[in-house]
Amino acid sequence: MFQPLRGIDDETEIAWALEWIIGLFESKGVDITPDIENTVWSALQSLASAPEDQRTLTGLSALLQDGDLRLALKPFTLEGAYGHILDGNSYALSENDTQAFEMEELMHSKALVAPVLTYLFHKLEARFDGRPTFLILDEAWVFLDDPMFAGRIREWLKVLRKKNVSVIFATQSLADIANSPIAPAVIESCLSRIFLPNNRAMEPQQREAYDSFGLNKRQVQIIASATPKRDYYFQSHGGNRLFDLQLGPVALAFCASASETDQADISKTIKAFGSENFAQQWLNFKGLEWAADLMSAEFNSEEYVPWLDAAE
């Protein structure tokens, strides 16, 4: 559960919160006028003086004098369908170097996509401080299908490189990008591309999408004849090549464990043995006892220095 209004005692945050709340109202068909903006601004200013755990959407609703605005906000409070995600009273995001968000629920609720992702993008943007960062947008169609996010991503692609952030789009279909209003920006800014095998790549409709990425007939033929789950076609200004990662059984035990069954087994393994012992126990579970034994022997060696400690 997120608490988007927690930091509104800060000038930058309250300005962002005004824009975000106005977006919620617009999504519910509210005609935004200067009077409505003033009403929301006054309510936010009043809420900013409350303790942090009271700066919630429910708290904001109580301060709004307009009944129509309270009604429009209700779905996003604890009284509505989406309050369990957006009406929290504590900070739910960690400051870990790796941060992941499960988007499956958002994919099934279009009304949640814009407010939740706007908030998450806002928090992530604040963390981009020049350190090398990957921003991976999996199932990219969720972002590309919304005009508001199309505009945001177009902006990000232009400026994030200056902050040492690499944006990675992942999508099951090139048409998601080719048919998006930000297709020119994506194609122009994403100079390195990796295409997965597609035995239908030479079909006319599919071919159009590949054409938009500058692939010629021979390159599309290579993609069409490549081996699924093994081959990848890399395209860049520096050259193009079909490659195979040649992952062995140990690497595949981790990199290829993406099914729902695998994820359930991973959760069970962590619950039973803890996260610190996960790698060894997962190798055992996958029938790679020899690799688990090697890892155990290495970890128990007096000469072993964890890479995190070594980095310090």
Where are these regions (language model features)?
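P-loop NTPase motor domains
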Residues: 2-165, 169, 178-181, 219, ...
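C-terminal regions of RecA-like/P-loop NTPase motor modules
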Residues: 174-312
